[in-house]
């Protein structure tokens, strides 16, 4: 089953799904902007197209992730994103 989600007045949209080879995950697109997301459980985020500038919990500096690069977010935390151009991503829930 596919679950469609929309955040930040439609500037972020994702489709959640579950599969044997990937587990629970979502794929989505973020329009340009700045966002703060909260996590319930740990997440593995991989950039597909575009780029994400990320401030992870407890990190002193922003990091830039480009296509094929992955970052991890602890559960029960918040992280900040700056998006310059529409960017697609894959999020795996760990």
UniProtKB/Swiss-Prot annotation:
CDD domains: cupin_PpnP-like. Its EC number is 2.4.2.1, 2.4.2.2. One of its GO terms (molecular function) is purine-nucleoside phosphorylase activity. It holds the Pfam family Ppnp. GO terms for cellular component: cytosol. Keywords: Glycosyltransferase, Transferase. Belongs to the nucleoside phosphorylase PpnP family. This is Pyrimidine/purine nucleoside phosphorylase. The lineage of its organism: Bacteria, Pseudomonadati, Pseudomonadota, Gammaproteobacteria, Enterobacterales.
